[in-house]
Amino acid sequence: QRQMCIRDRTYAVQGEFAEIKWPDAEVYYVRTGIGKVKAAFHLAEAIRQVEPDIVINMGTAGTIHHKVGDIFVCRHFIDRDMQKLAGLGLSYQLDTSALLEQKGFCKHWTESATCNTGDSFLTELTDIEGDVVDMEAYAQAFVCNSKEIPFISVKYVSDVIGQNSVKHWEDKLADARTGLSHFFNVLKESI
């Protein structure tokens, strides 16, 4: 068992914070704020200061196809804002699996889901690609990929899009903290 310095575990709002208690890891927490720009900026600053071995994004997400309380381990990311410009040849997808594998992280985390990220909080059903939707993960994956730092995102489904999403998100933050804490401290216990 190796000693490692995770150092960056990101979350958007205080209500999503859940402590990770892994004996073989030093964890540094970064509250990035909501949205792609804030998430990218605050993560880049933290990376510059602490040079982490891996970045784990933890938080809530909406869904169309799954149920509240489900937890997804995301390795594939879509920027739904850039996806609209795909016809112009712009990239809008990232997969972080190769770097995780190359650096030896999350080998026993067999789950693999897709997170769809955009600048708006989705409240109405729309045609989106992916298992969950959020407002930060793609931007963080982009920053990490650019700096060759492994990245993974763990999302707790707090709301089903189109079913009073904003209200459900606010009401489910405590459940999300409990679910994410159980995921990291009981189910996974290490990276």
What positions do the PLM features span?
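Short, small-residue-biased leader/transition segments that mark boundaries at the very start
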Residues: 1-6
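Short hydrophobic beta-strand segments
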Residues: 7-11
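Short polar catalytic/cofactor-binding loops
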Residues: 12-16
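Glycine-rich phosphate- or other oxyanion-binding loops that anchor nucleotides, phosphorylated ligands
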Residues: 18-191
